[in-house]
Amino acid sequence: MKLHATSTQQYQTVTGYDDSGVEINAVHYSRSLLVMPETPPVDWPVSSFDALNAQDFAQIEAANPDVVILGTGARQRFIHPKLIAALTARRVGVEAMDNQAACRTYNILMAEGRRVALALILETPAA
C-alpha cells in the first residue's frame, strides 16, 4: 500500500509497505530495520519476533526515543516486559502492533514532531 505520493527528504517517512517489505522515502527495504525521523534507517539484526532479546532493545535505547513503535510482523504480538525493562525504566513507551499499523502510527507521530522510533521486524525466510 502506498502511503504518500512523494517522499520527504527532511524526515524519514514510510511511503509504502507490502508483504515484501517497507519503503522509507521511496527506498525499499526487505530486512528488519530501525527508523527515526531525522536519521537514515539502520539495519536491526532481528530475524523474527521469537528471536527478540534484550540486546535488540539496547540498540533502540541508544537512539534515545520518547516512544517506540514495534512492528511485530504480519500480526500483532505482545512483547515480554523483561525485554523492554531498560526502556520502561527510562519512561520510554513501547507499543507493539502489526507492521501495517506500526508504519501508519509512526508516520502520524513523526508528523506531530514526536521523537519516535519505528522498530520493524521483517521476518527472514528460513534457509
Model-derived regions: residue spans:
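Mid-chain, well-packed structural core segment of small domains
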Residues: E61-M97
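C-terminal structural segments of small proteins and small subunits
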Residues: G93-L122
